Amino acid sequence: MDARGGGGRPGDSPGTTPAPGPPPPPPPPAPPQPQPPPAPPPNPTTPSHPESADEPGPRARLCSRDSACTPGAAKGGANGECGRGEPQCSPEGPARGPKVSFSCRGAASGPSAAEEAGSEEAGPAGEPRGSQASFLQRQFGALLQPGVNKFSLRMFGSQKAVEREQERVKSAGAWIIHPYSDFRFYWDFTMLLFMVGNLIIIPVGITFFKDETTAPWIVFNVVSDTFFLMDLVLNFRTGIVIEDNTEIILDPEKIKKKYLRTWFVVDFVSSIPVDYIFLIVEKGIDSEVYKTARALRIVRFTKILSLLRLLRLSRLIRYIHQWEEIFHMTYDLASAVMRICNLISMMLLLCHWDGCLQFLVPMLQDFPSDCWVSINNMVNHSWSELYSFALFKAMSHMLCIGYGRQAPESMTDIWLTMLSMIVGATCYAMFIGHATALIQSLDSSRRQYQEKYKQVEQYMSFHKLPADFRQKIHDYYEHRYQGKMFDEDSILGELNGPLREEIVNFNCRKLVASMPLFANADPNFVTAMLTKLKFEVFQPGDYIIREGTIGKKMYFIQHGVVSVLTKGNKEMKLSDGSYFGEICLLTRGRRTASVRADTYCRLYSLSVDNFNEVLEEYPMMRRAFETVAIDRLDRIGKKNSILLHKVQHDLSSGVFNNQENAIIQEIVKYDREMVQQAELGQRVGLFPPPPPPQVTSAIATLQQAVAMSFCPQVARPLVGPLALGSPRLVRRAPPGPLPPAASPGPPAASPPAAPSSPRAPRTSPYGVPGSPATRVGPALPARRLSRASRPLSASQPSLPHGVPAPSPAASARPASSSTPRLGPAPTARTAAPSPDRRDSASPGAASGLDPLDSARSRLSSNL
């Protein structure tokens, strides 16, 4: 567009501000221009006649003086026109014509979106947004605010709280430093280095060196004093932490008032450049007068007062705690190391100061004849030798082990010696106290156990207990607490629910791994049970429960062997992974047997209220407990009508599906196997060796047992890496007639054949009470069972998916049979019968064997 065209928009006069248009692209770099006011006055070089909004004139197409034009726009035109006679600028953005490469943006147009997002407000000098200076200013401003890290999250609670604290710093004013900011952290660390240097170097320089005009000494003093003066200024802009209510003061006025009332005087006195004043005064006085200025070097000790800033040291300790959390150090170890290091460092620092003081006082007195320096003729010795003897003298006094090379003779040395002894005794007492507290805090549980056992010993002495009782009590405490005592209930009670469950599951992991009841159950059921267990220890010969008493607990065996005793002299062994005492909890009755500990037993007990509370939420597990209880009662020659009625009701109503019934039968089968192991003499000690790898997985055990129960082709237990694939071998037998029994084997292992019956669709996994349990399986003597194969072998076949045969009359059942009253139904096989298969009815009915022999023969016939 040229000057003759009406390219300008209505109302775009220099004296008016048009409405903002679409944001233009960022212009090329241009010299910084001052930001114009919203309504600039008319240009004095152009006529200020108004133009109509409907008649845009040529002045509407002129660039404003305040606009930023590109170099191409400055090639031609007058009064701010763009080159080539075509205005290429617009107050609202770039021209919409074809010539868009030459553009200038008017001052009336607002900043672009990129500038608003990437820059702050322009400075008073007209600095454009997005410049390098603004970027550095933003980065440095972020250093003054608390960052989002582990330390700040622990201090403020959440990321949102940290962001609110950052907004507080921004709104508090310019150059306000947060005490937890990164800048303050690095600054405090730098000041710590200067503190250590001044605490060590300044006393040595004042005491043992005469010439203070050397270049290293001047550089050290200049740098130190400069940093302390800067620290004095920064303290007026640093927030103050109120330890009582954890409030952080960020108001500049409050910071100034509080700093003036506390540490300002000490910091100001310590920051005065005394050395520079001495150097200036030295040129205006003669040398004789300057000799007396040596005594004025004591003024340098005012800097020591400024370096003992306890608040800064405490702030450093808080940051060290942050480092400990980052590097995953334990709090006890970190605090112990910090306390010991601080105490040792303070004692060494006091020894250093005392050593310098031992030489400084005689030096200020021009080394009198009775001082230790003159007596030893060490006035003209080197500073290292003088410092070594002075430090030895000071440490001898502080540790109260002597006076050094000779006893003090002058009054000054006597007072210095007494001062050293007082300081040393104080440090020694502090060290003993800290060391004692450290030792007690590192092993508080053992200390608590020792204190408790001392009370037990006094109790035994007071009641004059015999020696055997005292030994039993001692053994109990050793096995129960193992040298450490703590309130576990209180510790777990203070934790939240998820964390408490994780800890309980971890503590009881061995119990869960050894119990198929837990390993194959719902994880929620396992967690609910474990959170209610109580740990107990019993010694050999202790009767855990007695027959005929009211049961209030059941027990789970983690380690140990127990014997189940009845009045009929029938005994049954239980070991790791078993449980007992659940029968009376299920029936609300009395104990049906006594349980005695054969070894040291580590058990977990469960009260009756907690037991019923958990089982109300998991009915299948109640059914599993009831089924195992019926099987155990049958093995010791007893029965419970209440449990039988409950199980029959569940079977008839079809509450549980086939999968749940199979799991229940696996639990029953594994319980029988564990009893057989204990009866065969394989007793487990208090701390048994770890089982073979193929037995450690309870899930693999269940899968292998199920596969072997339903697959007659598997002639031996599945052991090895292929064990986990065994569920694919599980097959259901189609309904059909029961295959005929195989040819009989040896008479000792061949039970009498049970009457067969036609098969029908199965409705329950149990036979009717009183019916004989018929089993079909290969014969395997019990002595051939190895330790590795017993837990994985299918000693009791799982129930097939068919209906048990109708039960015969009660009179047809042998009276002396030890077969369980609730046994699995006849098992159907899909493969052809092998010659070595035989019916597995209990031989005890025909041969009149002892109950233990009957159980063993029943085990071999079932296998």
From Swiss-Prot:
One of its GO terms (biological process) is response to xenobiotic stimulus. Residues 17-47, 734-755 have a biased composition (Pro residues). Changing residue 321 to E: Shifts voltage dependence of activation to more positive values and abolishes pH-sensitivity. Glycans are attached at residue 380. It is found in: Cell membrane. The keyword Transmembrane helix applies. Residues 1-10 have a biased composition (Gly residues). One of its GO terms (cellular component) is HCN channel complex. The chain crosses the membrane at residues 189-209, 214-234, 262-282, 291-311, 343-363, 414-434. Residues 210-213, 283-290, 364-386, 409-413 are extracellular. The modification Phosphoserine is found at residues 119, 134, 641, 726, 743, 750, 757, 840, 842, 847. Changing residue 291 to Q: Shifts voltage dependence of activation to more negative values. It holds the Pfam family cNMP_binding. Disruption phenotype: Hcn2-/- mice exhibit decreased body weight, behavioral/neurological abnormalities and tremors or absence seizures. Hcn2-null mice also displayed cardiac sinus dysrhythmia, a reduction of the sinoatrial hyperpolarization-activated cation current and a shift of the maximum diastolic potential to hyperpolarized values. Mice in which Hcn2 is specifically deleted in nociceptors expressing SCN10A/Na(V)1.8 have normal pain thresholds, but inflammation do not cause hyperalgesia to heat stimuli. After a nerve lesion, these mice show no neuropathic pain in response to thermal or mechanical stimuli. It catalyses: Na(+)(in) = Na(+)(out); K(+)(in) = K(+)(out); NH4(+)(in) = NH4(+)(out). SMART domains: cNMP. Hyperpolarization-activated ion channel exhibiting weak selectivity for potassium over sodium ions. Contributes to the native pacemaker currents in heart (If) and in neurons (Ih). Can also transport ammonium in the distal nephron. Involved in the initiation of neuropathic pain in sensory neurons. Homotetramer. The channel is composed of a homo- or heterotetrameric complex of pore-forming subunits. Heterotetramer with HCN1. Forms an obligate 4:4 complex with accessory subunit PEX5L; regulates HCN2 cell-surface expression and cyclic nucleotide dependence. Interacts with KCNE2. This is Potassium/sodium hyperpolarization-activated cyclic nucleotide-gated channel 2. The gene is Hcn2.
